[in-house]
Amino acid sequence: MRVILAPMQGVLDPFVRELLTEVNDYDLCITEFVRVVDQLLPEKVFYRLCPELKNQGFTSSGTPVRVQLLGQHPKCLAENAIRAIDLGSHGIDLNCGCPSKTVNGSNGGAALLKQPELIYRATQALRRAVPSEFPVSVKVRLGWDDISQAFEIADAVEQGGATEITVHGRTKADGYRADRINWKKISEVRERLSIPVIANGEIWHWQDGQDCLSQTGCQDLMVGRGALNIPNLSHVLKSNAEKMPWYEIQKILQKYANVENEYDSGFYHVARIKQWLRYLNKEYNEANQVFDKIKTCQTAEDLKLRLNEK
């Protein structure tokens, strides 16, 4: 079984990827999306969103990283895919699942679910552009506002030449509602396709992973929010390990606060650690106490001081 760290825009940034892969055995990470509009992006854009490219596409602990592209123009997607591969990306992932209103309003992400033909053309363009030894993957949801086109969407991905597909078990309209998860439909998609299907959605603990594998018939899982709730989730899912103790999480947070970020405006780590603590609070009561301690922080220096307080 592979466990893949999902792309989460504005959450699973390079620094979080670095920290999570240090304490796990993730098989692959997907980056936050690189937005492609109508031109070939400069190298610095790829390096900013995927600094691992400067390390041959690996995190410092050796986990391969795959660049995700978001866009609607097949030709431009293909041109930027070639650049990402040349810089060291371990394949290319196409975003057809982001539910953000801003992204969808520009006809990107989940908006493509309404246009299976465009998914096909985009996937085909990527496959033709990317050398055959590099995988092309596509991340989708089950549909836009219902699951009636789930098979058509999946067929478009496979017929476009994708190596594998990740299926999030909800529609765009479902958002992240727990009661809307549909692993059964993922199973039906898997039975229909000949390429590997990676299951995604509502995988928080070891038992969730076992249930998802059983109900979908998939061999691989992708996790996002759960990886923030339990920082060693990959170990938990693969070997039923105990969740990481809080004192180890404190060390991770302190390390994150001390990472130098050349793109930081001064408030970056403050906002991100507050955000992470909200996820951790779902599994650790101590997260609330730490949040209360840092909630008035406005600078990185103040944050470091308070996190180091006993």
Swiss-Prot record:
Residues the UniProt record annotates as site (Interacts with tRNA): R35, N95, Y176, R272, K274, Y279, K295
Enzyme class: oxidoreductase
Co-factor(s): FMN
SUPFAM superfamilies: FMN-linked oxidoreductases
EC number: 1.3.1.-
One Pfam assignment: Dus
Catalytic activity: 5,6-dihydrouridine(16) in tRNA + NADP(+) = uridine(16) in tRNA + NADPH + H(+); 5,6-dihydrouridine(16) in tRNA + NAD(+) = uridine(16) in tRNA + NADH + H(+)
Protein family: Belongs to the Dus family. DusC subfamily.
Protein name: tRNA-dihydrouridine(16) synthase
Organism expressing this protein natively: Haemophilus influenzae (strain ATCC 51907 / DSM 11121 / KW20 / Rd)
